[in-house]
Amino acid sequence: MMDPLDNGLFDLPDYEHTEDENFPPLPPPHSPGADDEAEDVANGDDWTENAGQTQREEAPKPARRVVKRPQPKLDGQRLASQRGLPALRHMFDDVKFKGKGHETEDLKILLRQMENWAHRLFPKLQFEDFLNRLESMGNKKEVQTCLKKIRMDLPIVHDDFLSEEVVVQTEDHAIDMPSEDFSFPDELHVPSPSQPVKVDLSEETLQRIERNRRLALERRMEKMQAQAESQALSQATQSDPNEIPDDAFDAEMLDAVESMTGIPTASQSPPHVDKDLSLVLHSHDLPVQDVSQSPAPCPKPQGDAPPEKALSLVHSALPSTSDPTSPRKPLTEQLPDDADTSSATPYTEAPACTNTKEEY
């Protein structure tokens, strides 16, 4: 038998001086397209070289965010749309209320119609929440504009414009030309003037226009009547017929003063002087002006003295009749009787104005 040691069967190889073999890396786990990669590896292609390029090609793109069903919003534009406030104009055309005595039932019908309108406009909200949202949106510009158009009976939505049947007709103003063909240059062609537009309105529109015109005339007449009444009242308060004018009052006061002071006028007869009065004046040694002498000039009034001041001066100059020691008799005693009127000697014409202080 042969010895295995002799044959060198158990000799270990010299790993210190040998180099490791280069083995290809392990393939990736099984995935779609792994067979192709296995074939590449079998064919000697290195998949690591194309790894970066494969990742760039297979990188997923960011998905675009698309809203498929946008949720409706209760804003001013939706409230002014065809299902919004304009729909309320014709909602109660077919509704019949029972009238007096059935107010509760009529109110239920009204609320039911309003709830139906709110649900059609925005089904997402309950009726109470819809009313709260509607109240907060009343100040928006779109809502205010829509309300003004409704009050003025103006067209709002597209159907309102279609209901107004407007027919525009153009008339043919062509001039009869001869049968021969004439060629005119382009410079001589003048554009035809604008043709008159004939508008045919419906009967309902004409009735509405007539009603608005009548209401405007009534308001104008009421306004003019109110202005006329106010002007008449102001004129009546300014010129009161019961008020006495100042010039009439001054004339009456002047006549009263003249009658009390005893100043005769040109139309009055000269006064009669009693003999007893002259004797009394001589007994008290009072100076009496001679008739034959010229009358003393009447003093001119200083400024525009009021009649009350002249009256007070006259009363202060005359002696009092209530005093028993006064030399002047009462006027009742000075007046002559009817029997003595014929025997009394008439006095000569007295001057127009005498000095009262010098006479007495």
From Swiss-Prot:
<comment type="similarity">
    <text>Belongs to the CSM3 family.</text>
</comment>
<keyword id="KW-0131">Cell cycle</keyword>
<keyword id="KW-0498">Mitosis</keyword>
<keyword id="KW-0963">Cytoplasm</keyword>
<dbReference type="InterPro" id="IPR012923">
    <property type="entry name" value="Csm3"/>
</dbReference>
<feature type="region of interest" description="Disordered">
    <location>
        <begin position="220"/>
        <end position="246"/>
    </location>
</feature>
<dbReference type="GO" id="GO:0003677">
    <property type="term" value="F:DNA binding"/>
</dbReference>
<comment type="subunit">
    <text>Interacts with timeless, which impairs timeless self-association.</text>
</comment>
<feature type="compositionally biased region" description="Basic residues">
    <location>
        <begin position="62"/>
        <end position="71"/>
    </location>
</feature>
<feature type="compositionally biased region" description="Acidic residues">
    <location>
        <begin position="34"/>
        <end position="48"/>
    </location>
</feature>
<dbReference type="GO" id="GO:0000785">
    <property type="term" value="C:chromatin"/>
</dbReference>
<dbReference type="GO" id="GO:0044770">
    <property type="term" value="P:cell cycle phase transition"/>
</dbReference>
<keyword id="KW-0132">Cell division</keyword>
<keyword id="KW-0227">DNA damage</keyword>
<dbReference type="InterPro" id="IPR040038">
    <property type="entry name" value="TIPIN/Csm3/Swi3"/>
</dbReference>
<dbReference type="Pfam" id="PF07962">
    <property type="entry name" value="Swi3"/>
</dbReference>
<feature type="compositionally biased region" description="Low complexity">
    <location>
        <begin position="225"/>
        <end position="239"/>
    </location>
</feature>
<feature type="region of interest" description="Disordered">
    <location>
        <begin position="178"/>
        <end position="199"/>
    </location>
</feature>
<keyword id="KW-0539">Nucleus</keyword>
<protein>
    <recommendedName>
        <fullName>TIMELESS-interacting protein</fullName>
    </recommendedName>
</protein>
<dbReference type="GO" id="GO:0031297">
    <property type="term" value="P:replication fork processing"/>
</dbReference>
<dbReference type="GO" id="GO:0005737">
    <property type="term" value="C:cytoplasm"/>
</dbReference>
<feature type="region of interest" description="Interaction with TIMELESS">
    <location>
        <begin position="74"/>
        <end position="150"/>
    </location>
</feature>
<dbReference type="GO" id="GO:0005634">
    <property type="term" value="C:nucleus"/>
</dbReference>
<dbReference type="GO" id="GO:0031298">
    <property type="term" value="C:replication fork protection complex"/>
</dbReference>
<feature type="region of interest" description="Disordered">
    <location>
        <begin position="289"/>
        <end position="360"/>
    </location>
</feature>
<dbReference type="GO" id="GO:0043111">
    <property type="term" value="P:replication fork arrest"/>
</dbReference>
<dbReference type="GO" id="GO:0008284">
    <property type="term" value="P:positive regulation of cell population proliferation"/>
</dbReference>
<comment type="function">
    <text>Plays an important role in the control of DNA replication and the maintenance of replication fork stability. Important for cell survival after DNA damage or replication stress. May be required for the replication checkpoint induced by hydroxyurea or ultraviolet light.</text>
</comment>
<dbReference type="GO" id="GO:0031573">
    <property type="term" value="P:mitotic intra-S DNA damage checkpoint signaling"/>
</dbReference>
<feature type="region of interest" description="Disordered">
    <location>
        <begin position="1"/>
        <end position="80"/>
    </location>
</feature>
<dbReference type="GO" id="GO:0051301">
    <property type="term" value="P:cell division"/>
</dbReference>
<dbReference type="GO" id="GO:0000076">
    <property type="term" value="P:DNA replication checkpoint signaling"/>
</dbReference>
